[in-house]
């Protein structure tokens, strides 16, 4: 299971939201490209970027920061936020981005996503952000009636790289992941899954390792790294060794 550090961009700065609320954001002083380089030096093998401004409005405004990040590191970059057209994807690929994440368009234009996954096999990631099991779109501002599980089943036949599944109610809380939700997703797809939302400790990471054999490819971590709950090097050292006896029991998972 890979640990993937996250950079959320707003007005060219690194920020973190609390439960996806744009009115509850925290700014971090380090420049985005400096943060990316720092994490690469810590041992990160990939960086996850979200353009929050574009996710909200559909208009990309952080491209300068994105390009600086790509030029500053020598590891793959995956990016999401407001990606709703072939033209935008080509533009991001021209910057050197490795994979793009499609969220809102996965619901609003499924045929486009199907076409793009064929045109760019294994370079399209489907981002599924859910609250109470139902998918949210437009930067988490619009709640749909579509179940996350239904969307995963539908897109599992496409040539996508992976699913990123985020439980909005845990995102930015540092209170642990929604393992019940993650388990449900893993049970219905053979596509690699990346979990996001809620990681606040090494114990949270260790607890997720029980899902590796079920298809959990990685976990995205943001706030915990920014607030020095642990470092990438610390987490990587632990995740790369057999620590099954250290995995805490999550009673909800076994319910």
UniProtKB/Swiss-Prot annotation:
GO cellular component term of the entry, any: cytoplasm
Pathway: Amino-acid biosynthesis; L-histidine biosynthesis; L-histidine from 5-phospho-alpha-D-ribose 1-diphosphate: step 4/9
Subcellular compartments: Cytoplasm
Keyword Nucleotide-binding recorded: no
Cross-referenced CDD domains: HisA
The family this protein is said to belong to: Belongs to the HisA/HisF family.
EC number(s) on file: 5.3.1.16
Record keywords: Amino-acid biosynthesis, Cytoplasm, Histidine biosynthesis, Isomerase
InterPro entries on file: Aldolase_TIM (IPR013785), His_biosynth (IPR006062), HisA_bact_arch (IPR006063), Isoase_HisA-like (IPR044524), Isoase_HisA-like_bact (IPR023016), RibuloseP-bd_barrel (IPR011060)
GO biological process: L-histidine biosynthetic process; L-tryptophan biosynthetic process
Catalysed reactions listed for this entry: 1-(5-phospho-beta-D-ribosyl)-5-[(5-phospho-beta-D-ribosylamino)methylideneamino]imidazole-4-carboxamide = 5-[(5-phospho-1-deoxy-D-ribulos-1-ylimino)methylamino]-1-(5-phospho-beta-D-ribosyl)imidazole-4-carboxamide
Name of this protein: 1-(5-phosphoribosyl)-5-[(5-phosphoribosylamino)methylideneamino] imidazole-4-carboxamide isomerase
GO MF annotation: an example: 1-(5-phosphoribosyl)-5-[(5-phosphoribosylamino)methylideneamino]imidazole-4-carboxamide isomerase activity
Organism field: Prochlorococcus marinus subsp. pastoris (strain CCMP1986 / NIES-2087 / MED4)
Active site positions, chain numbering: 8 (proton acceptor), 129 (proton donor)
Pfam families, A to Z: His_biosynth (PF00977)
